[in-house]
A protein has these predicted regions:
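Flexible "cap/lid" subdomain of the alpha/beta-hydrolase fold that forms the substrate-access gate
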Residues: 2-27, 64, 71-105, 109-265, ...
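Conserved HGGG/HGGXW glycine-rich cap/lid loop of the alpha/beta-hydrolase fold
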Residues: 28-73
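Residue-level detector of alpha-helical segments with a strong bias toward transmembrane helices
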Residues: 32, 51, 77, 142, ...
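Alpha-helical and His/Cys-centered functional microenvironments
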Residues: 44, 48, 111, 274
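Surface-exposed alpha-helical interface segments used for non-catalytic interactions
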Residues: 47-50, 54, 88, 115, ...
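Catalytic histidine-centered segment of alpha/beta-hydrolase-like enzymes
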Residues: 268-281
Length: 292
């Protein structure tokens, strides 16, 4: 089925729905210039990129943030949540928007998908920035008996993969569950739009759509073991946060990218684009401009 586009303009952004195989993907753009695809993670939406979008638009880029399939204002398909399938949909969405080549920035689960996108479509992805995650199939599997300060960033990987039980326990209690995450994963929680994300994941199908990326981890690992046989050749920037993954994004990509650099943003938690937007952009913008 040929992709189609619905355009809805309001606020400072252009909101579009791109239909891929009959399913809508919500895309939000600002500015004009070289396109930069911004992929959020769990449990967030495109809104996590709002500060980055404004800054990149002012610097002459066209940032395009998405709601991943199954989340936010995008449709909620029954399957297709492994990173290869998600990357293919986003690549087709960018093509439908008129962009055959673009730069990519991914956070959290969005980092997993950004890596798959760069590996599967190397001629399309000019530069790749990855932040605040490790990638299943590239990183070593974490220890089950981890100390509490590590386990707080790990336990949900197993819980979210369970079939049906998370929804049964959390439905109607989304606020308590998600606030637990935001409280413990952030260092500057007051800067994070927690209520926006709670509303998004409390919407019908929101929980299942987010958990689906975790339930697809076995297939994503299988794919990534194949991807790891060839290193990325485009420039790659890995950004960590001092009070979250620290240098883990860089460590994950060592040996998997030819042209790799990394940085750790101090005094910051997991939600780096909201907690420390100025510092994040100070590293990201020169990289996208080709000055790093």
């Amino acid at each position: 089925m040929k992709p189609s586009i619905e355009r809805l303009d309001h606020d400072d952004y252009i909101h579009r729905y791109v239909r891929i195989d009959g399913q809508r993907i919500h895309c939000v753009a600002a500015g004009c210039g070289q396109p930069v695809l911004l992929i959020p993670g769990w449990p967030q939406t495109w809104f996590a990129w709002r500060h980055v979008m404004r800054a990149l638009a002012e610097k002459g880029f066209m940032p395009i943030a998405v709601d991943l399939p199954g989340t936010g204002h995008s449709d909620r398909p029954l399957d297709g949540y492994d990173t290869g399938a998600a990357a293919a949909k986003l690549h087709r969405a960018m093509a439908a928007l008129g962009h055959e080549q673009y730069q990519v920035v991914g956070h959290d689960v969005g980092m997993w998908i950004a890596y798959a996108l760069a590996s599967d479509y190397p001629d399309a992805v000019l530069r790749l920035a990855l932040t605040e995650a490790v990638i299943p199939g590239l990183a070593r599997a974490p220890d089950i008996f981890a100390p509490p300060e590590q386990n707080i960033f790990l336990w949900h990987f197993m819980f979210n993969q369970l079939t049906d039980l998370p929804e049964a326990l959390i439905a109607g209690r989304e606020k308590a569950y998600l606030e637990f995450m935001f409280d413990r994963w952030s260092h500057r929680r007051d800067r994070v739009a927690v209520d926006v994300y709670i509303a998004a994941y409390a919407a019908p199908g929101g929980l299942r759509g987010g958990f689906a990326y975790y339930r697809a981890i076995p297939e994503t690992i299988r794919q990534n073991r194949e991807r790891a046989k060839r290193k990325l050749e485009m420039p790659v920037l890995a950004i960590g946060a001092e009070h979250a993954t620290n240098d883990a994004p860089l460590a994950t990509m060592r040996g998997n990218a030819v042209d790799l650099c990394g940085v750790v943003v101090p005094d910051c938690g997991h939600f780096i684009m909201e907690e420390a937007p100025e510092a994040f952009i100070a590293h990201l913008a020169p990289f996208l401009e080709g000055r790093v």
